[in-house]
Amino acid sequence: MTNISLKPNEVGVFAIGGLGEIGKNTYGIEYQDEIIIVDAGIKFPEDDLLGIDYVIPDYSYIVDNLDRVKALVITHGHEDHIGGIPFLLKQANIPIYAGPLALALIRGKLEEHGLWREATVYEINHNTELTFKNMSVTFFKTTHSIPEPVGIVIHTPQGKIICTGDFKFDFTPVGDPADLQRMAALGEEGVLCLLSDSTNAEIPTFTNSEKVVGQSILKIIEGIHGRIIFASFASNIYRLQQAAEAAVKTGRKIAVFGRSMEKAIVNGIELGYIKVPKGTFIEPSELKNLHASEVLIMCTGSQGESMAALARIANGTHRQVTLQPGDTVIFSSSPIPGNTTSVNKLINTIQEAGVDVIHGKVNNIHTSGHGGQQEQKLMLSLIKPKYFMPVHGEYRMQKIHAGLAMDIGIPKENIFIMENGDVLALTSDSARIAGHFNAQDIYVDGNGIGDIGAAVLRDRRDLSEDGVVLAVATVDFNTQMILAGPDILSRGFIYMRESGDLIRESQRVLFNAIRIALKNKDASIQSVNGAIVNALRPFLYEKTEREPIIIPMVLTPDKH
């Protein structure tokens, strides 16, 4: 449902993902007959979303206004900013503007979905300017944990709207530094509204420099004499480069496992972000010719993904690599929301195999790509927005970020903590909430998109917690007799061989319930099914304090 009242002179600012959550970043700026979309990300599912692969936004508002959508502009190549693009393009073929690395990553995704040939894509950099009828777009360099991050400036008739994308202020970066001079100049020119990254609003200090992490990685690798398995985000090209440099300095060759990691290395080398001597990267088949002290394995799986290379290595199901005594596994990452349990489980599995594990909680081998409070205040001080909208964070993060904005002098009434689907209406001297449109989560489960709802997830949770009970009976509605059963089958509820008394009591309860239901002259399969569920559910809860899913199956005799 859409209920928006934008006046002709107002600029609309909205999000269909990224507010009140980490992930799904998808923002929009609209003015009259033009809409510009910034990013199109996915969110990784929390533990209670059983069987769900990804969560994407509901793209209905974009699809319903497709004739007005002029561009999808990308801040950088992380999954929570580009992962939704294939799902969006299946519904709306929008021109995409992205930097070289982000574009390479997007191409890989679109090729997997068979969408690359039909896609309209343009490469941009921080000097690019895009011009449309009423709006234009320019860019400025920021710093993040992936090359080529940019902030986006959308020039509207009412003023500039700036989306920072993910950022930190790293004064000793591995890649290009952020363009503070450009940010300050924008602030002096005047900025109508800032949409800024809230992820680390709970961190009071500056985040560590990527260079510090590189030094720690080198120091750790220098002290390891066995084989090293190095797991990180495949998209963290800077981290991979620093690990590769450490391998070269310590006389190690590098083998790569995991499709996304292999692609990242290829992209990093082609674009000049990974620079090592020829022969540093080797084929997996060459590992057998090297001593353990000469090997560093880069692999996917730092988030505990069950099918990624590291999990298969740990579980002994990888075809080419198994854990060996003397190995050390380095997790150069931290778990993203929803993955903590699976990461901890994987670490436990590796350590139970007698292999050392080094991870960011214990050692200084990971740093966030998101700025803490001091960096957020610096961004606000440089940009000096009239209005402020904290984005990219859960509500408490947005709330803290809003407080930081007040600390530097932005009036409380000029700060908007919004929800996905809210539309902020702006002019040069006014701001108001102009309405709301539907922006619910859409679940991706295998090839299914949006066909999994709350009822299915509830059933999955019930099955995982309490199992299922199948109650089977054959009845004759003409004679009002039970011909066979009732029989009880169970999966994930009780061990039937050890629960004979409960099974027999359940059968007695069902026999009486079915017998009473059959006495009704209007008895039907549906009514008997209902009687089975209504009798068995409270009985089982009374006996076990568990609520399995109950599936009744009423059969009738063959008339032939």
From Swiss-Prot:
GO terms for cellular component: cytoplasm. Induction: Expressed in cells (at protein level). Probably a monocistronic operon. An RNase that has 5'-3' exonuclease and possibly endonuclease activity. Involved in maturation of rRNA and in some organisms also mRNA maturation and/or decay. Has an overlapping but not completely redundant role with RNase J2 in the decay of mRNA. The keyword Zinc applies. Keywords: Cytoplasm, Endonuclease, Exonuclease, Hydrolase, Metal-binding, mRNA processing, Nuclease, RNA-binding, rRNA processing, Zinc. SMART domains: Lactamase_B. Substrate binds at H366, T367, S368, G369, H370. Disruption phenotype: Essential, it cannot be disrupted. Depletion experiments show it is involved in, and may be rate-limiting for decay of Class I mRNAs (they decay rapidly in exponential phase, are difficult to detect in stationary phase). May be required for initiation of decay of Class II mRNAs (more abundant in stationary than exponential phase, show biphasic decay kinetics). Its EC number is 3.1.-.-. Binds up to 2 Zn(2+) ions per subunit. It is not clear if Zn(2+) or Mg(2+) is physiologically important. Zn(2+) 2 binds at D80, H81, D166, H392. SUPFAM superfamilies: Metallo-hydrolase/oxidoreductase (SSF56281). Gene3D superfamilies: 3.10.20.580, Metallo-hydrolase/oxidoreductase (3.40.50.10710), Ribonuclease Z/Hydroxyacylglutathione hydrolase-like (3.60.15.10). PROSITE patterns: UPF0036 (PS01292). Homodimer, may be a subunit of the RNA degradosome. HAMAP family: RNase_J_bact. It is found in: Cytoplasm. Its cofactor is Zn(2+). GO terms for biological process: mRNA processing; rRNA processing. Pfam families: Lactamase_B, RMMBL, RNase_J_b_CASP, RNase_J_C. This is Ribonuclease J 1. Belongs to the metallo-beta-lactamase superfamily. RNA-metabolizing metallo-beta-lactamase-like family. Bacterial RNase J subfamily.
